[in-house]
Regions:
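Active-site rim helix/loop that mediates acceptor-substrate recognition in acyltransferases
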Residues: 26-54, 62
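Conserved hydrophobic beta-strand within the GNAT/NAT acetyltransferase core sheet
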Residues: 85, 116-118
Length: 152
């Protein structure tokens, strides 16, 4: 049974998750080499920029989701963000993404925040079914994006 834990307490998985994210969202990292992103992501576990919750099973990393201080530089007035949701292919179809997302939402609410944002180019229907609302559509990285929010 997978357990959800904070990456800051299991930093041996930071570089792997950062690499998965760099590959999955390559269009967002065109100007940022992997090593730079790995350093930023690891530092973010301590400074609050990228507070990541991960799924582990027998100390094997299955995926993660982050609470990001700023995930869309063009919209600095919006914060915080659900970001970096990724499940390894072999661990999909087990409900892990939804568990991670709901736990990020619960932790955010427990800290007194009442709204979360996200952006997606291909999962707006998935998030809409889980209580997220489209705030606007925009183009970034050559793709149509949906800016979504969820009141907690």
């Amino acid at each position: 049974m997978p357990r959800l834990v904070w990456l800051r307490d299991h930093m041996q998985h930071s570089d792997t998750l950062a690499q998965w994210l760099h590959q999955q969202f390559a269009y967002e990292f065109i100007e940022q080499p992997l090593a730079d992103w790995q350093r930023e992501f690891a530092a973010g576990q301590g400074n609050g920029d990228w507070q990541c919750l991960i799924a582990l099973e027998n100390d094997q990393l299955l995926g993660g989701a982050a609470l990001a201080a700023n995930d869309l530089p063009e919209r600095p007035e919006l914060s915080p963000w659900l970001a970096c949701v990724f499940i390894a292919p072999q661990a999909r179809k087990r409900g892990l993404a939804e568990q991670l997302i709901e736990d990020i939402c619960a932790a955010t609410k427990a800290n007194g925040t009442t709204r979360l944002y996200l952006h997606t180019h291909d999962r707006n229907d998935y998030y809409a079914k889980r209580g997220w609302q489209v705030q606007e559509c925009f183009e970034a990285w050559g793709k149509e994006q949906w800016l979504m929010l969820r009141d907690l």
